[in-house]
């Protein structure tokens, strides 16, 4: 049998060599030392040989981490990042594994409606999407403003239903005549410090 010209390895063990050794007589081969000295462990990913199994195990752990990073990069690439983002996962998949998840970059969902309740003086705001507008005096739907669209973008979404509410007029951009504060384009803050009213 010609074992020197062909070899078949599985997990670093030459299979053809072991079968030919079993077929040969029990005569020792010349120049062979103990079995542990001549045994080499081969990486199944890059075919690099190692002297012991511990070194091979550590090396294969590095391959495992590389595969995890590539798998994460592929998952991110299949989900698709927004087009306005300056990051291209196809150019370097290892770097794309450290990118923020796409759902953090997508357009935010609108927050629930905030209802102004006329019945309770201690807690004026109620949160809920299923409250009907006939039970509330006014409602405020903040949409994109709470997520970085700017407070001025909320001013156009304020609607009042029946009655004159100074709290709602402040959000809509009207001036509060009692305090003299002019709120322009939606929400404004009086940042002047004073000791009294």
From Swiss-Prot:
GO terms for cellular component: cytosolic ribosome; nucleus. Highly expressed in roots, mature stem and lateral branches. Expressed at low levels in rosette leaves and siliques. One of its GO terms (molecular function) is zinc ion binding. InterPro entries: GIS3/ZFP5/ZFP6, Znf_C2H2_sf, Znf_C2H2_type. This is Zinc finger protein 6. Disruption phenotype: Reduced number of trichomes on sepals, cauline leaves, lateral branches and main inflorescence stems. It comes from the Eukaryota. GO terms for biological process: abscisic acid-activated signaling pathway; cytokinin-activated signaling pathway; gibberellic acid mediated signaling pathway; negative regulation of abscisic acid-activated signaling pathway; regulation of DNA-templated transcription; trichome differentiation; trichome morphogenesis. It is found in: Nucleus. Keywords: Abscisic acid signaling pathway, Cytokinin signaling pathway, Developmental protein, Differentiation, Gibberellin signaling pathway, Metal-binding, Nucleus, Transcription, Transcription regulation, Zinc, Zinc-finger. A zinc finger (C2H2-type) spans 41-63. Induction: By cytokinin and gibberellin. Seeds over-expressing ZFP6 are insensitive to inhibition of germination by abscisic acid (ABA). Plants over-expressing ZFP6 show formation of ectopic trichomes on carpels and other inflorescence organs. Probable transcription factor required for the initiation of inflorescence trichomes in response to gibberellin and cytokinin. Acts upstream of GIS, GIS2, ZFP8, ZFP5 and the trichome initiation regulators GL1 and GL3. Acts as a negative regulator of abscisic acid (ABA) signaling during germination and early seedling development. The keyword Manganese does not apply.
């Amino acid at each position: 049998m010609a074992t020197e010209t062909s070899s078949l390895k599985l997990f670093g063990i030459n299979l053809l060599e072991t079968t030919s050794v079993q077929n040969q007589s029990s005569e020792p081969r010349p120049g062979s030392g103990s079995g542990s000295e001549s045994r080499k462990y081969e990486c199944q990913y890059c075919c690099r040989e190692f002297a012991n199994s511990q070194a091979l195990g550590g090396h294969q752990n590095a391959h495992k981490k590389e595969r995890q990073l590539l798998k994460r990069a592929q998952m991110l690439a299949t989900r698709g990042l927004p087009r306005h983002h300056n990051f291209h996962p196809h150019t370097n998949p290892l770097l794309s594994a450290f990118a923020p998840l796409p759902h953090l970059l997508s357009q935010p969902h609108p927050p629930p409606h905030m209802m102004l309740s006329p019945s309770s003086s201690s807690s004026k705001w109620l949160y809920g999407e299923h409250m009907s507008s006939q039970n509330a005096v006014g409602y405020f739907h903040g949409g994109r403003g709470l997520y970085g669209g700017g407070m001025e973008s909320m001013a156009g979404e304020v609607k009042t239903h029946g009655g004159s509410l100074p709290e709602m007029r402040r959000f809509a951009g009207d001036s509060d005549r009692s305090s003299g504060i002019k709120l322009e384009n939606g929400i404004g803050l009086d940042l002047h410090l004073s000791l009294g009213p």
